[in-house]
Design a protein with these regions (language model features):
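Helix-helix packing/entry segments at the starts of transmembrane helices
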Residues: 55-61, 127-149, 182-218
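Hydrophobic/aromatic residues within transmembrane alpha-helices
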Residues: 1, 46, 72-74, 131, ...
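Cytoplasmic-side transmembrane-helix entry/capping segments in multi-pass membrane proteins
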Residues: 24-33, 78-90, 110-111, 135-145
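Hydrophobic transmembrane alpha-helices of multi-pass small-molecule transport proteins
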Residues: 9, 13, 36, 78-100, ...
Length: 252
């Protein structure tokens, strides 16, 4: 996924920024890329030891981690209403996943991996916010994705994972993940974090199940369950409340 993303971005980067290769001398994007790589590593590994419902609950804690990082280290002026919005959105994620949720102790190791993935996702957005104020969008994107791909490649090599022989279908999925969730999804987050607190950006990620449900309803004619509807409603209310309180904070 990250390799193909870098592959797509490379021609543009080396054409437009071929005289600005000093970007590679900056150590800070290496750190952000490392955080992103750790997020993906722990997140994907978590599914080997726990189920989707448990993993979603713990990854949904990402906005809370981000809030704590901004509160403790960035002195971001976030009103209490933002925290209330986060808790509402977390409750919505819990409602959506309730049908696939098992006893946490049964899947403890996988749950801890998902929780760790949430923490590093928060670190990725938190550190990226300050860096985006100093580095142009496209070079930042390219550098972070490149370093993340290199670190993930190193992790795979250490684990003895082969880079070849996965079949046409799997490589097509990798391409799809690169074009959609990475180049559109993650890149949008990296653009937004330049203008919004990382907490608000990470909170918006919790809206993903809502979009997925709508697409499944439109394209696959899947029914929207009551728990999905109620959980989605809570998530939207939470995102709205956090955003409104953030705007009030920004007002003179």
């Amino acid at each position: 996924r990250m390799f193909f993303s870098v592959l797509f971005l490379s021609p543009v980067f080396f054409y437009k920024y071929r005289n600005d290769l000093d970007y590679f001398l900056d150590i800070r994007p290496v750190i952000v890329g490392f955080f992103l790589a750790l997020h993906f590593f722990f997140w994907i590994t978590a599914f080997e030891y726990t189920n989707v419902g448990n993993a979603v609950i713990f990854i949904a804690l990402q906005p809370l981690f981000t809030y704590l990082l901004e509160y403790l280290f960035a002195k971001e002026d976030l009103r209490k209403g933002v925290l209330t919005g986060i808790m509402l959105a977390l409750a919505g994620s819990l409602v959506i996943s309730i049908g696939d949720l098992t006893m946490l102790m049964e899947k403890l190791w996988g749950d801890l991996l998902a929780l760790t993935a949430a923490f590093f996702a928060a670190c990725y957005l938190f550190r990226g916010r300050s860096l985006r104020e100093e580095i142009e969008y496209f070079p930042y994107l390219y550098l972070v994705y490149t370093y993340a791909a290199l670190f993930l490649g190193l992790f795979a090599f250490i684990q003895g994972v082969s880079f070849t022989g996965h079949g046409v279908y799997n490589y097509s999925c990798f391409l799809g993940l690169a074009l959609g969730p990475t180049l559109i999804g993650h890149s949008s987050l990296n653009y937004s974090v330049r203008f919004l607190p990382a907490t608000i950006v990470s909170l918006a990620i919790l809206g993903e199940p809502i979009l997925t449900t709508i697409l499944a309803w439109v394209l696959l004619h899947e029914k929207i369950t009551l728990t999905t509807f109620l959980g989605g409603l809570l998530i939207l209310i939470g995102i709205y409340k956090a955003s409104v309180n953030r705007q009030k904070t920004s007002s003179p």
